[in-house]
Amino acid sequence: MFKYFFTILLTIPTAHLFANNHKSDTADLDDIKLYDIVKVEHCLDQAYDTIPGHARKLEFKIEGDDPIYEFDIESINDGFTYNVECNAEEGFIIEVEKEVSADNKIFNSGAKISIEKAKSNAIAIHPGKVVSQEREIGMDGSLTYEFDIQTDVGYEIKVDVDAVTGKIEEANIELYEIGMEKE
């Protein structure tokens, strides 16, 4: 009995060293409750009114000083997946982009730089590992490469690169993501 008690007594003080031995990009989640934002259901309803379909993923990110819900919605009309962004303070849709494949003729005819060049531009500014990449066509006809980068300093950032100029259009810190990309 004493032997077991002695082993437990020695183990308890060192257990915390192993329990928190990982990087987390969710450290800022407690800050979200300080935002004055609409319910996610309100923005989801707005997104469904814009693109009828099925939500596959939800991301919460900060664009400038605005909190944004971004939904990936698989359209019941054409089967494409759309990224629908909703301003979480105001509750209205601010952007819609259609995800397209690598062989999309419209995207390929308009894009002037390769996805590899766009990726190197993004990583040069935000060093880390690209964990996902997409080709998107905006409702205004704009062509964008989108990269999710797990940065070397521990947070995830979403970087949009203009497929015509190669310039970074925006880079936004992603606070959380629920769901998965369609395979």
Please state what every model-predicted region is.
Residues 2-8, 16-183:
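Long, terminal "pre-/pro-" and other extracytoplasmic accessory regions
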